[in-house]
Every structure is written in C-alpha cells, then in structure tokens.
Amino acid sequence: MLHKTRGIVLHTLPYGDKYLIVAIYTELFGRVGYLITPARRGKRGVAQALLMPLSLLDLEVEHRNDRDLQRIREARSLSLPTALQTHPAKNAEALFLSEILYRVIREKESDPPLFHFLFDAVRHLETADAGIANFHLTFLFRLAVYLGIRPNRETYVEGRYFDLLEGIFTEEVPLHGRYLNADESRVMARLTKMTFANMSLFAFSHTERSAILGHVLDFYRLHLPGFPELKSLEVLRALFE
C-alpha cells in the first residue's frame, strides 16, 4: 500500500553492491528501514544527495507488513539547498545528532510530537546564523523531554549538586558518586534555560562546552541502556576548538 509521509534521514548503510539500507524517522510510521536503489546514470532510483544525515524528505512509500525493509517510490527534498552540507559546523552537528538519534530512537510507531520537534530542530539548524556551537547542547536538553529523562530544574538552588542518576539537584552529595559538583551543577541548571531562540546568548569556552557535553552524554548513558560511545563526537569537539 502506498503512503505519503515526511521523514528525517538518520543513517545510511551499504547493502551489497547495488543497494542502501536507510533508517528514516517518519511522521506516519516512526523509525523505518528502507531498502533503496541509488540513482545511477540512466537508471531510476533515489539520489544519494537526498540521503545526507538529517535530510528532510517528502516521501511516497510502499509499506507491507510481511517485510522488514520497506520501499520508497518517490523522494523529494524538503531541506534548504546545501544548508547543512556546505557549512562545516552545521555538517558536524548533523553528523553527531543523527548518530545519537539513530541510537536512541527505536520505536516503530508514529510519535507526532517527537517528529515535529525533530523536524523543527533541523529547520533551526539550517537557518541559524549565530550560536551554532551551542546547537547540539540545546538539542540534547530538549530531546531529553521527549525521551522521558528530562533533568528536573525546579529542584535547583545555588550550591546544590546535580544527581546524574536521579536527574535532580540535591543538598547532600549523592553517595553513589554519579553527580556534578556545585560549579558544574550551576552550569547544568543554566543550560536547562537554553532554547534554539536564545542559544546565541550563552557564551562558553571550548573547555566548558566540551565538559558540559561530556556531562550530558553521561546523563544519557545512565538513563538509556545501551547508549554507545559516539564515533562523531571527536569530530564535533575538534571543530569547535
């Protein structure tokens, strides 16, 4: 049966000599694996330029319940032309965040609020002209809400410690040792106020931003079983040195 849906490219993997398996987060079906024949000279197929990380697509897809990999009949770009691919910082952000999404989104059911958040976030990245170095931090904090692991900022008071296991700020040092000190906790509380609209107003040194990202990834790792080491992390960190 044919369906029309929007989608966001998460990951592309070669399959044999002629095919690609592409993980796409779709508006109608959640995460779906598609078996794709790349377009070649004189032959129909999906242009590989459409399959870059976090590409936004308008799709006509064929779904059948008796197969694990579905098919794309037509694909049209909804992304702004070359907005991510030609900008080194935005390209690094897209690689990093698409890797995270590929690892944490497993649902094969539609989740409209999550899809709309992701679609709008990619649009913000495409059009941003300031604060790009803070985009991934903003994104990860906002994504945590949809994953059900949002840090509880309401518990913050100056001098408290952020408990990475419980996701709250506490007066006492947690005995389990998974916590941030008072200075780190102050920064964590500050970051919970950051949005795509105001991210350019938050100034951090490379060292601070790298440390903050490490804490956020530790938080994800503690709350999302199987969260892996990320191949694109060092590329992102090196770019913003």
Residues covered by each model-derived region:
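Non-catalytic alpha-helical scaffolds and adjoining flexible linkers that form interface surfaces
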Residues: 1-241
